[in-house]
C-alpha cells in the first residue's frame, strides 16, 4: 500500500493498494478502447453485437441501445423531451461511461415506434415488457479496455499479476466526481448544507486548467455577475450552468435558481458527496488492517444482513454510505468514521432534510471489489477485460496500473 497523489486524495482515495511502479498510458485514446456491456441479473450479457430477450405483454418497451461518446443522463433527458414524456417514464439499470462505447437496456413507458435519430446512438432491438428496467435487474458490467501509449510495460504487467490475488479497495472511481472539474461532491456538500452561495462559487468561480476556453470565459462572466453574457457563452451541453443562469435572469433567488437544475443531476451531486465520504472511510479502514479480514468494530454482511462483527462470525466487511437509517461501525473503525464526518461538517440527518426528490437514505457498500473473469494481454498496448458488479468502477483497477498524477491526461 502506497500513498496516492493529491488529485486522488481530493476524492477520498488516499492510497494505492499495489506498490508496483506506475505504467503510465492512456485508457481512452479512442471510444472503442473502452467498451462497456451491461450484464443482467441472470448473467445475460447485453453484447454490442446483439441480444435476444423473451418479450412479455405489458405497458413498457425495452430497447437495446448502443452509444458512443454520449452521456447517459443527457440522452435520457433528450428522449423525454423529444417524446413528450416525464422523467419517470424512462428508466435504466445504470449510468454508463460517456467517453466509451456502451451497450445497455433502457425502458420507455408505452409502445415506442418513432425514436429520433441521434448521432452516435443506435437503437438495435425492441421488446414489449411488463415492467421497467431497474438497477435491481442488473448484475453489473463487462469491460474490455485497451491501454495505449504505455510508458513502462513491465510495470503494467507486474501490477496486473498482483491484481489477480490482492484485495482491491472498492473505491468510487474518478467519473463519480469528474476529472476535468472534480467538484460533484463539493456541489453535493453545498446542497446538503443548503449553502446556495457556496454552490454558486463552486459552479462558477472555481475554474480548472483543463476546461475549455469557452467554459472558462463563461464561468468568469457568471462569477462577476454578468449572467446574461455567461448564458450566451455557455454551449447548450452545459445544462446545469444554463439552468441556474436562466433562473437568476428570471428573478429567482439563488436557491430556487439552483433547484431549477434537473432533479436527476442534483441527485448525482448529493450521491457524489456520499461517495466521497465512503472513499474517506475506506482509506481509513485500509490503515487499520487488511480489507478482507474483519476486525473489531467492523460491519459485516452475512446472507444479506449487516451486523457488527464478532470473532468467528465471518462475513464480508462493509462500510456505510452516509444517510439516515444505517448502522455505524464501532471501535477504532467507528471512531475514525465519526472523526471524518466531523471534519467534513456533515451529519447523516442532513441527507433527510433535503427537498423532495433529493432525500437520500444511507446504505452499505462492500470494501473489497469483486472482480470476475479477469484477463489481460500485454504487447505494445495492454488489453484488460473483466466483469464488475453494479456500482463498482473499472477505473479503480486501471488507476492501480497507470498510477496517474493527473488522471485527465491519461484518459480518465
UniProtKB/Swiss-Prot annotation:
InterPro entries: PsdUridine_synth_cat_dom_sf, PsdUridine_synth_TruD, PsdUridine_synth_TruD_CS, PsdUridine_synth_TruD_insert, TruD_catalytic
Gene3D superfamilies: 1.10.1510.30, 3.30.70.3160, TruD, catalytic domain
Domain spans labelled TRUD: 167-370
EC number: 5.4.99.27
A GO molecular function held by the record: RNA binding
Annotated active site: 97
PROSITE patterns associated with the record: TRUD, UPF0024
GO BP term, pick one: tRNA pseudouridine synthesis
EC class of the enzyme, as a word: isomerase
Function: Could be responsible for synthesis of pseudouridine from uracil-13 in transfer RNAs.
UniProt cross-references to HAMAP family, sorted A to Z: TruD
Name the UniProt record assigns to this protein: Probable tRNA pseudouridine synthase D
Organism (species): Pyrobaculum islandicum (strain DSM 4184 / JCM 9189 / GEO3)
